[in-house]
Amino acid sequence: VGTADYLKKLAEDNGCTVEVTDLEGTFRAGGSKRYQRWVQQLLGLDTSDPVAWRPDGRMEVMVADSPEQMQRFIRERGQEGLTARITAGFCWPWSNPDGNRLVDDVGIGGWSMPWNVKPEQSVPDAPKSDLWSTDRRGVEQVGCVYTAQTFEYDWNGVIIGPDLLFRNGKFRVDRTASRDPAFPGPVDDDIVDRCIRNAYHVLLTRGVIGTIVYAVDPATHNELRRLIPGTIGMQHYDGAQPKLTAEGSQLPPAYSRRDG
């Protein structure tokens, strides 16, 4: 019950003409099979080693050199009417609200942002967790894997925390850096390793137009710069305030210069 063949036969038995269409891609990642394969290779979820990203005209992939840079880029995409969100690995505590405000748990250097609202809670001026990806106010919170899974948005910023480190040509997991409550002490290292890699796979595949990545660990960030040719840079538009754009990769229509 529920298979394509069953539904086709049921429709034909009721006098319907059936046309079967194969869906070769997905809306996520612009339908880019290359990007989805690249993410699997990057995270060590198949037998291939990580490779450099090669633009395919479907998906934009770039590196941010700071969380501030990523945040500004994501906010600008939101101001253009696109959906744009930041997510991160579960490497920071997820506090209850301090009165009527969220706690800035996700901190990197002098930068910080709060996680999204917990599912069972409500905070003024912030969307509930199930609306985080669609409510425009969600751009001001960092989403975790439990909130981001099953959703998609146009631009996807991903902060790779210290639980995933690039060493000797591959990513390795450091479970001691994870704050995920799903990993109590008795859980086997192999299970934790797989779950953390899968969590980043979820985070890296939410974007429809493009993904921006930043790694907390300096060595990991340097490797990402090597594997991803596109970076976020500064460009002026007709004397206006500078806007963050992509250097090293083709600018998509969403933020190409418009004359007039």
Label each region the model flagged.
Residues 1-27:
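ASCE P-loop NTPase helicase motor core
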Residues 1-9, 37-42, 98-116, 172-176, ...:
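Short secondary-structure boundary/capping segments
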Residues 11, 43-46, 207, 211:
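Conserved NTP-handling cores and scaffolds of large molecular machines
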Residues 19-21, 25-35, 43-152, 156-164:
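Conserved helicase/translocase motor-coupling segment
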Residues 136-241, 245:
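C-terminal accessory regions
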Residues 253-254:
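Intrinsically disordered, low-complexity segments enriched in serine/proline and basic residues
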